[in-house]
């Protein structure tokens, strides 16, 4: 879960730089824009930009190539709904999103590849941030691991919300995990 889009971008950039081969399903296109501009250092990343007409073909391609990958990032659940016309029934889209993520997770389990689905917290409710209803139901009830990423001073902080072997509330701080760090690293090598 993310409240800050820049923190989400920096965290996913950090992950893609630490894994050998990443499949990145970029629904909000932010990662792709920064990647194409040369701001991100990654090892090998295959970026998929789904659209309504290509969703089935893209899903098949992703599922087939997951065996050669080390991580799949599905970014961002909230942007999934923007792929379809406004008149499309929400229940149908929620079901399609659920099936898509479950296919990715099942295939990930079969080939031992973790799947990270990102979601932005969308609106304030009584002083706190709340996920949109559809992504909340899907991610909060189906996720094996729940993380929250935000800033701690000028560093990226990952907080464990739920994990089978790490205590909830534990915080990992990534010092200097901003895009400027990745950009300078890229030009030094």
State the predicted function of each range:
Residues 109-189:
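Phosphate-binding/switch region of NTP-binding enzymes
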Residues 42-45, 64-68, 93, 165-168, ...:
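Short, low-complexity, polar/charged sequence segments that are solvent-exposed and flexible
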Residues 28-32, 51-55, 78-79, 121-125, ...:
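Conserved nucleotide-binding/hydrolysis micro-motifs of P-loop NTPases
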Residues 25-26, 47-50, 75, 116-120, ...:
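Conserved beta-strand segments of the P-loop GTPase G domain that flank and frequently precede/overlap
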Residues 61-141:
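P-loop NTPase motor core
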Residues 1-65:
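Conserved P-loop
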């Amino acid at each position: 879960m993310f409240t800050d889009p820049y923190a989400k971008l920096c965290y996913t950039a950090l992950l893609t730089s630490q894994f050998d081969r990443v499949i990145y399903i970029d629904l909000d296109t932010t990662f792709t824009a920064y990647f194409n501009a040369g701001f991100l250092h990654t090892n090998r990343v295959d970026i998929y930009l789904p659209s309504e007409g290509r969703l089935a073909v893209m899903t098949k391609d992703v599922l087939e190539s997951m065996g050669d990958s080390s991580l799949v990032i599905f970014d961002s659940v909230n942007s999934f709904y923007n792929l379809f016309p406004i008149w499309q029934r929400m229940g149908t889209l929620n079901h399609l999103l659920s099936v898509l993520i479950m296919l990715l997770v099942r295939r990930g389990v079969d080939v031992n590849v973790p799947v990270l689905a990102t979601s932005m917290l969308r609106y304030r409710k009584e002083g706190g941030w709340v996920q949109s209803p559809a992504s909340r139901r899907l991610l909060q009830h189906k996720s094996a691991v729940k993380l929250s990423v935000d800033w701690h001073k000028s560093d990226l902080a990952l907080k464990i919300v739920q994990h089978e072997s790490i205590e909830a509330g534990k915080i990992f701080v990534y010092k200097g995990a901003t895009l400027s760090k990745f950009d300078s690293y890229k030009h030094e090598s």
